[in-house]
Curated annotation (Swiss-Prot):
GO terms for cellular component: chloroplast inner membrane. Belongs to the bile acid:sodium symporter (BASS) (TC 2.A.28) family. It is a multi-pass membrane protein. The keyword Nucleotidyltransferase does not apply. May function as sodium-coupled metabolite transporter across the chloroplast envelope. It is found in: Membrane; Plastid, Chloroplast envelope. Residues 1-64 form a transit peptide. Pfam families: SBF. It comes from Oryza sativa subsp. japonica (Rice). Its main location: membrane. This is Probable sodium/metabolite cotransporter BASS1, chloroplastic. Keywords: Chloroplast, Membrane, Plastid, Transit peptide, Transmembrane, Transmembrane helix, Transport. The gene is BASS1.
């Protein structure tokens, strides 16, 4: 009896396995086999046939997955967009690294600009008042892009920090100016100028330095606005009590200037960050460069306009101004930490107290004091607090605040 031969079995095919976490299609046909071992784990796309749809790992959107088993990237759907996205990310990372280097070298750029302005004033005399407003406004816009509307609301809910900074602004600096002028026995015109600048509100440059020093930018903006609004009353009052001469201030002019260069750009930046985040992510790497360049140019311009007076004023007035701002930075931080304010906000208060609106002091001294040398301490102040602030920004930027242990 002949042996019965079993008919050849049909090629076995492994059925499709549906796993809740992973969809893989396997077959013994090597032409259609998917190879996954060499692909990135975080972004995986499996292409098993030219006629079958592209599958992806469950939970990972296919729009984010550009890796494939096919060795020819040009044949992978979406591969071109992936290369373009990678190129954009690469350039953005490069700009971020350059901006970080510029930010860490902030003191060097400011000091260099001041030295050049003192040596060759015409190099910085081209800066017009309108250019100053535009430069500061763009910088404030960049800082506003780091905020959200919720950040500004949170700052408004910080009465302790806001009140402490306001009180330190109008107590530490005026008293320091008065005591230093007495201690160094300054001439009357230098003493009046030193007291005048110590009674001025916080300067808009403090917001830039706070931004670079990783401080609380929203709190800085509110402190600058609050001290500026109060300057219409407190600056002439404190100056008249400590310097013996009344100084008139235009409150509406202060309000308009503050709104133009601080409040409006910051609010616009926060709105852009809230509703146009894609645009913000695109331009944000350029903002550190704009901030550093703006401060350096404005400081150089302040020195260039008063170079002859600064050179002829001697060491005494320079020393007095340096002591004034050093006391503001030091006591602003130490007293804030003493009363239990967090590190980031203490940095902000220190910068706000130590940095004054020196330009306002120059204008008031030139308009309301008979001796033009009264404006010299104010001009020196614009350089001194910028150098101090830039040094602190460089140090604090490399030391991110850690308030978790408080």
């Amino acid at each position: 009896m002949p042996l019965l031969r079993r008919p050849p079995a049909a090629p076995h095919r492994t059925p499709i396995h549906h796993d809740k976490r992973l969809h893989l299609f396997s077959t013994h046909n090597t032409r259609h086999r998917a190879t996954v071992s060499s692909l990135p784990v975080t972004c995986l796309r499996i292409r098993y046939s030219s006629s079958n749809p592209v599958r992806h790992l469950c939970g990972i959107p296919s729009s984010r997955c550009h890796a494939a088993a096919d060795p020819a990237p040009s044949k992978i759907p979406g591969g071109g967009s992936g290369a373009l996205e990678a190129g954009v990310v690469g350039w953005r990372d490069l700009l971020l690294q350059v901006g970080e280097v510029l930010s860490l070298g902030f003191p060097v750029w400011v000091a260099s600009a001041c030295a050049v302005a003192l040596w060759r004033p015409p190099a910085f005399l081209w800066v017009s008042p309108m250019a100053q407003i535009v430069g500061i406004s763009f910088t404030m816009l960049g800082m506003g892009m780091t905020l959200t509307l919720d950040d500004l609301k949170t700052a408004l809910l910080m009465p302790k920090e806001l009140a402490s900074g306001f009180l330190l602004q109008y107590s530490v600096m005026p008293l320091s100016g008065f005591l230093i002028s007495k201690l160094l026995n300054l001439p009357s015109y230098y003493a009046a100028g030193l007291i005048l600048v110590s009674c001025c509100p916080g300067g808009t440059a403090s917001n830039i330095v706070t931004y670079l020093a990783r401080g609380n930018v929203a709190l800085s903006v509110l402190m600058t606005a609050a001290s500026t609004f109060a300057a219409a009353f407190l600056t002439p009052l404190l100056t008249s009590k400590l310097a013996g001469q009344y100084v008139a201030v235009d409150p509406m002019g202060l309000f308009v200037s503050t709104s133009q260069v601080v409040l409006a750009p910051v609010l616009l930046g926060a709105l852009l960050n809230q509703y146009c985040n894609g645009l913000v992510q695109l331009v944000s790497p350029l903002m550190p460069f704009i901030a550093v360049a703006t401060v350096a140019v404005l400081c150089g311009n302040a020195i260039a306009q008063n170079a002859s007076a600064i050179l002829s004023s001697g060491l005494q007035v320079v020393m007095s101004v340096c002591w004034l701002h050093a006391s503001g930075f030091f006591f602003g931080y130490v007293l804030s930490r003493t009363i239990g304010i967090d590190i980031s906000s203490s940095r902000t208060i220190s910068i706000e107290v130590g940095m004054q609106n020196s330009v306002l002091g120059v204008v008031l001294a030139s308009k309301h004091f008979g001796n033009p040398l009264t404006a010299v301490p104010c001009a020196v102040s614009s350089v001194c607090h910028s150098v101090y602030g830039s040094l602190l920004a460089g140090i604090w930027r490399s030391l991110p605040p850690n308030d978790k242990g408080q």
